[in-house]
Regions:
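A donor-sugar binding/catalytic signature common to diverse glycosyltransferases
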Residues: 257-298
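Donor-nucleotide binding loops and adjacent catalytic segments primarily
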Residues: 189, 194-264
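Conserved donor-nucleotide binding/catalytic region of nucleotide-linked donor-dependent transferases
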Residues: 315, 321-339
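C-terminal alpha-helical cap of glycosyltransferases
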Residues: 337-356
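A nucleotide-sugar donor-handling region in carbohydrate enzymes
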Residues: 149-207, 232-237
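Conserved N-terminal ligand/cofactor-binding loop architecture of enzyme catalytic domains
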Residues: 23-99
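Active-site and donor-binding regions of nucleotide-sugar-utilizing enzymes
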Residues: 73-164
């Protein structure tokens, strides 16, 4: 790879996009590249990035129906003329071009949908000479990711790559998810019989501790013989509430997700995001339950449609899925094997591969 210089465009919206950017940067540096990470929210006019983050966090937490409506209007797949993020992307134009002039990259890699809109617009207008290879972090490739000005799309699944290719006319490849190597290292062969005691089941709420009826779900699982381990992110209030559930473990933000995955028997997930793909790498089955609105729900459905998770529609469905996936046998083994097989290629290699 020599002296290739790569500017990665992530976003401080939760922790997932930056985690992907960071892991891609690590892989690229290992291949001899120079990298720089940029939070795309800092390219927006002063105050806009924090306001956008606060609005998204607030609506997902307190007004999920409103966020679902916004997603349906601006981002959900489908034909027809609808408003998009072009006006917002235009406001980042000058600042991104300044970053490009300062760092002099040979390649831009957006890992957040707004960043993909910014680079796509600038490439289409001919003012950005540096190619842009987009890494799509979502299982459901929504409209926000898609712009024909970008040079390449690297996606999590073949279905995602086909959607990107059909919508943009640009090349699209499949790598599978991007996770740090420690998650693969904890994926050693699981014992045929579970350890004594209630099986530990992780409940994920992301970096912000966002979810619906999370504590109620923990009580339900505890009442049916599980040991719920609630990942409350940075929401201390949620952690305190969850800690009062008999038999449950409530954790705040942790830097040892790989260790938790190595000890878990199952992940109950609500976003089909980075925690879910970390579970795939670690050999932990994923069960989608009460996913976040908008891209969370679409992503959970797409992940399940790809055979990488189980989608529960109601409490009875949840408990039945938990029983099937905790029990040693072909159902659990098949889902674990499909999850591990999702990692089909090195995204860093695909993103930097010369055209043709």
């Amino acid at each position: 790879m020599g002296s290739l210089r790569v500017l990665l465009l992530g976003a401080s919206m939760g922790a997932g996009h930056d985690a992907v950017s960071g892991e891609l940067a690590r892989r690229l540096r290992a291949r001899g590249a120079a990298t720089e990470l940029c939070d795309v929210l800092t390219l927006l006019p002063p105050g806009t990035g924090p306001a956008l983050r606060a609005f998204y966090r607030g609506t997902v937490r307190h007004a999920p129906a409103l966020y679902a409506a916004i997603y349906a209007l601006f981002l959900s797949p489908g034909d027809g003329h609808r408003p998009g993020s072009a006006p917002l992307a235009a406001t980042a134009r000058a600042r991104l071009l300044r970053r490009v002039r300062a760092f002099r990259p040979d390649l831009l890699v957006p890992t957040f949908h707004l960043a993909a809109q910014i680079t796509g617009r600038l490439r289409a207008e001919g003012v950005l000479s540096v190619p842009s290879s987009v890494f799509v972090t979502d299982f459901a490739v929504h409209r926000g990711w898609l712009h024909p000005g970008n040079d390449l799309y690297v996606c999590l699944t073949a279905q995602g790559a086909e959607a990107a290719r059909a919508a943009t006319g640009r090349p699209a490849a499949v790598s599978g998810p991007v996770v740090a190597p420690e998650f693969h290292r904890v994926a050693g062969p699981h014992p045929h019989a579970p350890e004594p005691g209630p099986p530990p089941v992780l409940l994920s709420t992301g970096a912000w501790g966002v979810g619906t009826r999370t504590v109620r779900t923990a009580r339900l699982l505890a009442a049916h013989g599980c040991r719920p381990v609630l990942l409350c992110g940075r929401d201390e209030r949620l952690r305190r509430r969850a800690a009062r559930v008999p038999g449950a473990v409530a954790l705040g933000w942790t830097d040892d997700m790989a260790g938790l995955m190595g000890a878990a028997r199952l992940l109950v997930d609500n976003a089909a995001g980075q925690t879910a793909v970390q579970a795939l790498a670690a050999g932990v089955p994923v069960l989608a339950w009460r996913p976040l609105p908008g891209h969370g729900r679409d992503g959970a459905r797409s992940m399940a449609a790809a055979g990488l998770s189980t989608y529960a529609h109601d409490p009875d469905d949840l408990l039945a899925g938990v029983r099937r996936l905790l029990r040693p046998g072909p159902v659990r083994t098949c889902q674990v094997e499909r999850g591990r097989a999702a990692f089909v290629a090195d995204a860093a290699e695909l993103l930097t591969r010369p055209p043709g």
